[in-house]
């Protein structure tokens, strides 16, 4: 990583962080020997769980390994003066009731909605004085159709119907996100009370079926087929298909030709912000500001959050019930229940005494698919990139496309598939798929005047290189240079604008953020690891084989993304169990 000041851009001193970032919160009253509930990990789901439990009167403590809260939803000043959303970088999926219930606006959350939201520049020679074409999509359907018509009149006419079709599927899936999956084990073998409770979990499924109606078989195909098959049924132009397909493969070690890739696309279109379906935006101050707002909501009601307090072990009594945790320094903290925001692998294979868990359960956890294609590169630049397809304004101020997700090497679905095949051979993609975002285009607080922060979400990248070779600094820099070379073709001068960079390969994402294999979802969002089967079959309702232990992170239903649903749902399940103790 290099840092230097150039042009209009001046690096400034690091700014202070909130209290729970500078040190742990013992100064707020100290660590107590006992709480009603302990949450392992201060990722956004863990913070959401703590906030709900505390509001329900459950005295809750959160223990975070790192010096900063938020997990992957964090803001870090890696280069002085530049504040990066170091891992997660966009917001849309956070459940609307969490905004309301936790009063996040009251606790400082501010959003910048993006419109337009998608920009795909072409690599083609302009005819005469014409610049290369680009595809710019936003909330104005008429303008979207005009943009798409550059490539296909037919696709322009069909696009509103496609959007309506996907919107209906998102509406059907929506109720499933806010409740535990159907508890088939309780339904088949539980007590009468357990069976009655499990019947209530069928309601979201029945509601989804009613919404989809006679179109259910067609929607089933969307969830199970390769996204290329789905998109080919709608469209003919590659720039549009490839742009849409990026949402089906982002964060997933899959090709657009992989069966089931359609669900990941749906996962990225079913969100919304401030009542706008499908809207995505930037959090003012970076993603860490969201985590700060949730933490503020939790602590205002009495929750305790401790940083640099690593949980080493879940404590179990002689009757096989959870009774608290042991910290890395040997401190014992008793509790009636433990909610783990860490991955299923860390929770069950590292923190929980193995003798208390069924062998088959442990085997299934160890077999979870955690492959990740992602390398995240955070870049400080001294000016905005100027794309051949959309040159910068004379004074260098942000233009509409700068606020978008900018898709590079994405003009054709074949490019996406070829990038995937490289990784399957143990090689970094020759032409990586790049999603480039510039949050400082809407939030100038993230960088010094005249400067910007650039988020590069790139794939595909194997965890281990061909021949079993591990990542080292030379390989890491070589890959980042390749990514920069690709950007340079679309936006000449980009490389010269770079002030510094932070390169996070899959092993780095695993080491720093605890993401298994670097997987941003904790484990793959494939159909065999969703709903009934997340993290494993018969244990998808946040409860674990060990009484009093709950999974509340992205490895639980409904999965990854900055959604908060797993934390909220797990908190409600745990609270119901606590009342019945």
From Swiss-Prot:
Molecular function (Gene Ontology), one example: oxidoreductase activity
Signal peptide segment: none
Swiss-Prot/TrEMBL keywords: FAD, Flavoprotein, Mitochondrion, Oxidoreductase
Database matches in Pfam families: Amino_oxidase, NAD_binding_8
Enzyme class label: oxidoreductase
InterPro entries xrefs: Amino_oxidase, FAD/NAD-bd_sf
GO CC term, one of those recorded: mitochondrial matrix
Subunit note: Interacts with COX5B; this interaction may contribute to localize PYROXD2 to the inner face of the inner mitochondrial membrane.
Family listed: Belongs to the carotenoid/retinoid oxidoreductase family.
Function of the protein: Probable oxidoreductase that may play a role as regulator of mitochondrial function.
Protein name, per record: Pyridine nucleotide-disulfide oxidoreductase domain-containing protein 2
